[in-house]
């Protein structure tokens, strides 16, 4: 019984992207899950030929011609004899050679015709069974092809669904990355603006007592992003 075998594999990838926090930012992570599916399809077509055997008994026709003839002849002969002599005589009802030969030929002809009817009926039945077998195989082949087409359509639909899901996940990941970059840019801009608004002031004063005298050195530094001012004052005694 020959059959064909097809093996198909389907790989599903799922990607998960965690959300971003507005306070702490960790490196973007993606979780990829792979799911592999294998489909094995076998196909075959086979038909067992079973010709039903109908064993019909031959028709039986009960012919009572011999008994009827004997009754008619006997009664008629007895009536005639009674009128003539008042006695009866046994009648010999054995068939003549001509009748026997005719009966034999009829029996042979009946047997031949009966065999011919059986052969014709068997041939007709075999022919119809063969036609039915061909029709059944054609219908089975048609159904099998339709099922194969449906299976191919189902696989193509699942592939399209997987492609669409992956494309959707890619777009979502790109959108998340874009939003994270925009958030980082805003935080950098916020830090720059805070530095521009901030001021830093430093006061330094140094006092030295030496043999030459008393020395005092002082200075004030005020810095900002756009302005740096340094003022130094030096005193010597």
UniProtKB/Swiss-Prot annotation:
Transmembrane feature ranges: none
Domain characteristics, as noted in the entry: CAHS proteins contain 2 repeats of 19-mer peptides designated as CAHS-motifs that comprise each two octapeptides connected by a tripeptide.
Residues covered by region (CAHS motif 2): 169-187
Function field: CAHS proteins are cytosolic heat soluble proteins that seem to contribute to the anhydrobiosis in tardigrades, but their specific mechanisms are yet to be identified. It is possible that protection during anhydrobiosis might occur via the stabilization of vitrifying small molecules such as sugars, but not via the direct glass transition of CAHS proteins themselves.
UniProt feature, compositional bias: Basic and acidic residues: 1-17, 91-105, 226-237
Keywords: Coiled coil, Cytoplasm, Nucleus, Repeat, Stress response
Subcellular location, record wording: Cytoplasm; Nucleus
Similarity section: Belongs to the Cytosolic-abundant heat soluble protein (CAHS) family.
Residue ranges, annotated region (CAHS motif 1): 132-150
Location (main, coarse): cytoplasm
Any one cellular-component term (Gene Ontology): cytoplasm
Misc remark: Trehalose, a disaccharide essential for several organisms to survive drying, is detected at low levels or not at all in some tardigrade species, indicating that tardigrades possess potentially novel mechanisms for surviving desiccation involving tardigrade-specific intrinsically disordered proteins (TDPs).
Coiled coil spans: 98-201
Protein's UniProt name: Cytosolic-abundant heat soluble protein 1
Region (Disordered): 1-35, 85-105, 212-237
